[in-house]
Amino acid sequence: LPDAVAGTSAGSIAAGLYASGMPVSEMEKAVRQLAAHGNDYLDPDYSGIMEFVPRLLTGRKISLQGYIKGDKLLSYLCELTAGKQLDESVVKLVIPAVDLISGQTLCFTNSETAGAQMHVRWTWDAYLCEAMMASSSVPGIFAPRKIGSWLLVDGGVTHNQPGGLLKAAGAGPVIAVDV
């Protein structure tokens, strides 16, 4: 089994669950639950959607940040990870997200040896579920996640395959899968 994991977007959920110490069999159950009852974890931004069409038709500024708020999915992810912080991860972990304000990649990690990377900032202070949700917030679909001073979206915007970031965080040999 790996001693370090990284993931972007949906991969951040797999990486975060694994890093939380969840057995693979339980991860499979969680994914089946999400697949079978996915609508239960979606919370559409109805007020934003209702304002979208009139604003579009009248040429006014559109303020809809995403069709789905993401709060219900975040709650589910927090439940699955038992509210653990990054530093409670059982393996080295890297989860990238992108800050809409600066354009930089923000990497959530528990690695104390994360090395400098151009246009990358590292943070150690977050809940696993927050990092997973931020990295999974596909722009236009999910609203960006506000964490501290950052406004975060899907890490795949800049790092679709985060193997290099995992290496920069001090991981040994890296096997990367890009799907």
What do the PLM-derived regions correspond to, one by one?
Residues L1-T8, G16-V179:
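Patatin-like phospholipase
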